[in-house]
Amino acid sequence: MKKKSKIAICGFNLESNRFAPTCAESDFRENMFFVDQEISDEARKDSPAIHLGVKGFYSEMNKLFGHDDNWIDVPTMVIGSCPAGPVEEAFFNEFLEQLRLKLLAAGPLDGVYICQHGAAVATHTHDPDGIMFDLVRRVVGDETPIVATLDLHANISELMTSAVDVLVGYRTNPHVDMFDRGVEAASVLREMLDGMQPKKYTIKLPLVAPSVTQLTAKGFPYGDLIRYGQEFLDEDIFNVTILSGFAFGDTPKNGMTIIVHSRSTVENAVVVAEKLAVSAWTDRTRYLPRMTSLEKAIGLAQQAQHSAEDAPFLFADPADNPGGGGRGNTTYILEAFIAAGIKNCVFSVFYDVAAVELACKSGVNSEIEITLNSQETNEYLSLIHI
């Protein structure tokens, strides 16, 4: 009887904004914190609360092996926070120790799937992702296949690439292919279990693309580059991952990273990676942000409120994006619009616990006076009474 493959599943998901408040254990527990059998149970639900990459991995593994009884899943820890600041050292070290003990207790493993974001920063290190990858490698040994999925905003270190055999990055922003990348990770891992020994080559460019230039729709440079990369897929080149990185991580490992995987030789991966690097660098001026000044925004808003023919406008402060670790509570646009007398506009989304509590107490359709940012202070905030 053929031996069943024993596969560990783990993951640490955090996109760290260097300029945001630190991230604690409570931030992970509020968002995604699954251990042991909870991981498998959640991944097999129709609408899971766990990362969709994990669901995709389980789904494809069951298909590839015929049934979930034909492979042995070893769920350990899959945790994740909403984008936030650097993770606290004590909690991260505790996570690493728990993960290490769970992997050791699992005994000899045939493979590991890591569902990771890849842009974490800790209060004590620029590279918690690399430290975790290296820990997994040291526990399972050099011969055990390890495949990781990554957010396309991942900031890649040499430790990350050396510790893991295959790095599979998202190809969409907004991210709608997390499930698919989990499926791909399972497919690659199955090939490795059957004897495929992947070779990869990595190029990091001195190019830190602003987040507003990283959409993957047609006409955006990053999307065009990703689609160009997929044209090289064939019987030998099985994965091309292009990670734009996350500027607000503010680490030495920032920069666009191109990773090409080959089934046969690293030389084949080098050829493709260099072509993509040349294309990205040639297009570097396309990544210059084209922002709207506050003055122009006021003018557009004034124009719109006096002309029914003008389409509605949406103005946002992208540097304060909660999806990128911002707090969602800067008031620059609000203050400018109030000073300019802009009317008939909706103000949203704003993070202020005290304001929410007061609004809830006052009830629907009530009018209230509030002071925004009354309970939080930092150099980017100001109090404003409305």
Regions found by a protein language model. Give the residues of each.
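Short glycine/threonine-rich loop-to-helix capping motif typified by GTGT followed
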Residues: T123-P128, L215-G219, Q302-H306, P322-L334, ...
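Accessory alpha-helical/coil subdomains and C-terminal extensions
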Residues: E60, D194-L300
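Generic secondary-structure signature for well-ordered alpha-helical cores
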Residues: G66, L104, R138-G141, G169-T172, ...
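Active-site histidine-anchored catalytic micro-motif
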Residues: A8-E15, F19, R29, P83, ...
